[in-house]
């Protein structure tokens, strides 16, 4: 439970009446301290999430944070995560664990996000929904659900949605199809099975960033020079997984999970012909890869093996096979390049990765009010690349990473409603295939010089549940060696290198309380000082980074407050305010995206009439039309650091549910 967990853990339940468009995870996990959410207004690059400063380097997707959906990894075996396959229309709740404490999850530095889909219950029902808004944004959804009709029969939730938008900026339109299904069996022998399958297909144009003058002149624009490249991304992913748990008796339980998936991505970049012609080692301006990935987790949990103890022992296995190609992004027409097409082959390789991680976690209640939690995980990851494009030499290679990851926490239940804890955990983060794909020196082949980062996190916290509300206060320090940081971004291509030492120190505070009946207030604040803790030497044209500089992409202060009236039916509404401090955009700290505050408001009405339920809503985001950067592209080589956020924008929707 909340008070018994010796870590910063936050849970968000799906609201009884939802006023979101059910498109982006940022609509759900607002207000979590140390979780910085950045909506790029760019569906080609997914959301940017960072936790305690980890993940801010990512130019697309999620890094440094493990993602799970119904116990199935939404993070690839190499550590690259996506939120695009998380179905918000059937979401039950989200749990956020800040810090690397848990031994039950794979290697990461920042923390873990666990999302859970609703299970079918009660009568069969159908839900139809439609929402629309600014920039011709629209989403249509269908949800079918029902409870089990008898013993050993499944309950089910099946959802499907279609989303499209013209986008806030020029060349930022997107289309998305998302299908999700969850079947759950509660068997007569006490075991439980969940089977989850999802499919997502996205086509998204990429407006890329703006420099400061371009942003000030017109935040909606795409740089005119980039229009000729038709920069865009196509994504198609299918994944399925099964979880099984069975109590053997009142003291022993078994758990198993297995999953597999396929992901295909084609991305057209804005790299000119002259750049591609300049070196035989250049991989071209089109990225095209297909990944098959799979894994399993097996765990035994036993209670009272020794008095007042709980022990979990398990092993996790993951593997991925990637077929990666690179093509020129042009054809010659009358001797001139015509961009935005797939041209000649410039890269062809087969990449494989696998890991087998045994782990143990134990809890000992050695005194009535004192508990010791410990864990250890041996993480070992093996990369191999076979080069099939040999005209510029054979760049095949392999590398291995491994680390023993201990963790420990001591907690004291001072009062039934008050708990204090101290903890230590070692984190481990390996580079992804994408981070290793290009060398910062411009040479061909994988960047096998990029090593895994290791971190040591120390934390102390206080939790309380009383008549004044639920409180969480935590102070933490994370020291990282060989931190994986950006070496540069240019025309959509990113390179990475290791920073000898970095330091993150901070404070998290969260509070929520039901003030009266269905009126709830929430507030949170985070202070995070993230710096380079040693000089990073110059590398070619990349300048030296002096010790003490702030790590770019991370706000030092962030705050959130909300007030919501959410009855099960009738009139409902709410308002929230978010503050984000300025964010440096490069390692030299020569420029920054300014701080901002944005306000959102929503109102709606829910009718319940027998077997029918109707929910209507309207909302306005960025109520006061603030011009701010929703995200930054760290170390962009063309100084196009800024991805402007939407101005004042509205959305409205209707959901109709019929039970049978």
Where are these regions (language model features)?
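Short acidic/polar hinge/loop motifs at secondary-structure boundaries
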Residues: 65, 72-98
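Short strand-turn segments of transmembrane beta-barrel domains in outer membranes
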Residues: 100-102, 112-148, 160, 167, ...
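Transmembrane beta-barrel wall of Gram-negative outer-membrane proteins
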Residues: 132-164, 169-207, 232-248, 313, ...
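Conserved C-terminal beta-signal and adjacent last beta-strands/turns
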Residues: 186, 198, 422, 458-460, ...
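Face-selective signature of the C-terminal outer-membrane beta-barrel domain
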Residues: 192-194, 198-200, 234-388, 469-475, ...
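Membrane-embedded beta-barrel scaffold of Gram-negative outer-membrane proteins
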Residues: 245, 253-271, 413, 419-425, ...
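Structural signature of Gram-negative outer-membrane beta-barrels, strongest in the C-terminal barrel
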Residues: 291, 301, 305-318, 349-480, ...
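Gram-negative outer-membrane beta-barrel transporters
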Residues: 300-303, 367-368, 372, 381, ...
């Amino acid at each position: 439970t909340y008070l018994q967990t010796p870590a910063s853990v936050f849970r968000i339940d799906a609201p009884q009446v939802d006023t979101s468009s059910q498109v982006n995870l940022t609509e759900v996990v607002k207000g979590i301290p140390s979780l910085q959410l950045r909506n790029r207004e760019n569906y080609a690059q997914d959301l940017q999430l960072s936790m305690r400063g980890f993940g801010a380097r990512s130019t697309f997707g999620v890094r440094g944070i493990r993602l799970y959906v119904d116990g199935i990894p939404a993070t690839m075996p190499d550590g690259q995560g996506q939120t695009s396959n998380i179905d918000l229309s059937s979401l039950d709740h989200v749990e956020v664990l800040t810090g690397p404490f848990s031994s039950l999850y794979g290697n990461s530095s920042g923390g873990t996000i666990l999302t859970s889909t609703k299970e079918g219950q009660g009568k069969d029902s159908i839900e139809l929904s439609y929402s629309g808004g600014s920039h011709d944004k629209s989403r249509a959804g269908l949800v079918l659900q029902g409870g089990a009709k008898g013993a050993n029969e499944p309950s089910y939730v099946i959802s499907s949605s279609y989303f499209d938008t013209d986008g806030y900026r020029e060349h930022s339109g997107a289309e998305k199809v998302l299908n999700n299904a969850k079947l759950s069996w509660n068997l007569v022998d006490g075991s439980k099975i969940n089977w989850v399958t999802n499919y997502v297909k996205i086509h998204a144009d990429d407006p890329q960033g703006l420099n400061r003058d371009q942003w000030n002149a017109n935040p909606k624009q795409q740089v005119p020079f980039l229009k000729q490249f038709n920069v865009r991304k196509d994504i198609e992913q299918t994944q399925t997984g099964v979880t099984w748990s069975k109590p053997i008796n009142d003291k022993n339980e078994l758990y198993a999970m297995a999953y597999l998936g396929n992901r295909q991505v084609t991305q057209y970049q804005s790299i000119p012909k002259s750049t591609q012609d300049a070196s035989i080692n250049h991989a071209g301006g089109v990225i095209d890869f297909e990944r098959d990935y799979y894994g399993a987790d097996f765990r035994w949990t036993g209670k009272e093996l020794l008095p007042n103890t709980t022990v979990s022992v398990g092993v996790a296995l993951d593997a991925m096979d990637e077929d990666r190609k690179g093509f020129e992004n042009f054809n010659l027409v009358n001797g001139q390049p015509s961009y935005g097409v797939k041209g000649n082959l410039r890269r062809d390789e087969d990449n494989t990765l696998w890991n087998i991680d045994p782990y143990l976690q134990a809890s000992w209640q050695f005194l009535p009010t004192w508990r010791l939690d410990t864990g250890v995980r041996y993480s070992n990851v093996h990369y191999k690349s076979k080069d099939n494009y040999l005209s510029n030499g054979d760049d095949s290679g392999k590398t291995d990473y491994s680390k023993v990851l201990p963790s420990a926490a001591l907690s004291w239940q001072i009062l039934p409603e008050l708990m204090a804890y101290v903890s230590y955990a070692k984190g481990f983060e390996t580079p992804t295939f994408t981070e290793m794909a290009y060398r910062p020196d411009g040479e061909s082949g994988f960047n096998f010089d990029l090593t895994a980062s290791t971190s040591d996190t120390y934390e102390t916290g206080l939790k309380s549940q009383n008549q004044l509300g639920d409180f969480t206060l935590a102070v933490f320090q994370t020291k990282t060696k060989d931190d994986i940081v950006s070496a540069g971004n240019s025309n959509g291509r990113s390179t990475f290198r290791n920073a000898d030492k970095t330091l993150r120190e901070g404070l998290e505070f969260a509070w929520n309380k039901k003030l009266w009946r269905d009126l709830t207030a929430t507030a949170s604040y985070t202070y995070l000082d993230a710096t380079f803790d040693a000089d990073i030497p110059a590398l070619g044209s990349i300048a030296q980074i002096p010790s003490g500089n702030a790590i770019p992409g991370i706000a030092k202060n962030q705050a959130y407050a909300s007030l919501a009236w959410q009855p099960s039916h009738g009139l409902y509404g709410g308002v929230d305010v978010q503050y984000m401090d300025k964010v440096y955009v490069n390692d030299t700290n020569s420029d920054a995206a300014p701080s901002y505050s944005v306000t959102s408001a929503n109102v709606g009405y829910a009718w319940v009439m027998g077997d029918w339920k109707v929910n209507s809503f309207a909302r306005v985001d960025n109520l006061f039309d603030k011009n701010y950067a929703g995200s930054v592209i760290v170390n962009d080589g063309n100084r196009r650091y800024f991805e402007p956020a939407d101005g004042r924008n509205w959305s409205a929707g209707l959901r109709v549910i019929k039970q049978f």
